[in-house]
Amino acid sequence: MLRAFAARSCAARGFSRPAAGLLRAPSLRLLSADAQRRGTYEAPTEEKQLAKLQPRIAELYRKGRYKEALAVGEECHALALAAFGKQHPAVASMCNNLALMHKSLGDTDAAAALYKEALDCYRVVVGEEHASTATAACNLALLIRDTDAARLQEAQALLEGALQTRRVLLGEGHLTVAATMGHLASVVKLDGADGRERAKVLLEQALAASTVHWAKPGESAEADLQRASLLHSTGLLHKEAGELSAAEEAWAQAAEIRLGWLGEKHPLSAASQRDLQALREMMGGAE
């Protein structure tokens, strides 16, 4: 998941390490070959303002000041429209960032509309099989998953397409591919017994890839924390199937990883510890 400033998260880039979910705008300039060669390009006023404002959105988002970030994002969106017109990657990036702010503020209807606008724009200007399109599809799919159970098939289709694109662009063993498999598993598991079985396979494949392709445990926070996320999802699947011992094993591993990298006060570490403790109490009561 302002990743178009970036990722995963949420992808295109406005600062070196964008905040999760933020998409940084792609290169904004559309230079003639002659202007590039002679170095005579002068960015329009809107583009200069946009370049200055983008980092501010990320800063406000990281601080949880979503209303202020939304206001700056709306200004950026207007500047991008004025500079490039409606069908441009920079405009799609701004739509993604506005959607994230609305989502953070609890306005999921506005967020869904903006995520859809970003996705439609990317499909037109960069094509279906592009990294930014895959990111936009994931953003919309995850919002649908969390807010509209009647549209789970749509969410699944979006994630299937994003996974296919990312496999081609990044390779089977990439962290982002594994994350997408985890997202897809979280949707397909809701589709009865067959869906749960497919979710299990997806998570097993992602964890197997982590063993072969990723940094060894303890060497990379990014890899380890993605592994912890997959383990937590695996444990939840086992718990829902009544396989409590398997759930405990997966959750214990996830909790240990998160504690080691994030510390006990981090929300993810605390949540893992609470879930694991509650599960063990449940298992004790069942004995």
Regions found by a protein language model. Give the residues of each.
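Intrinsic-disorder-linked linear interaction elements in eukaryotic regulatory proteins
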Residues: 1-287
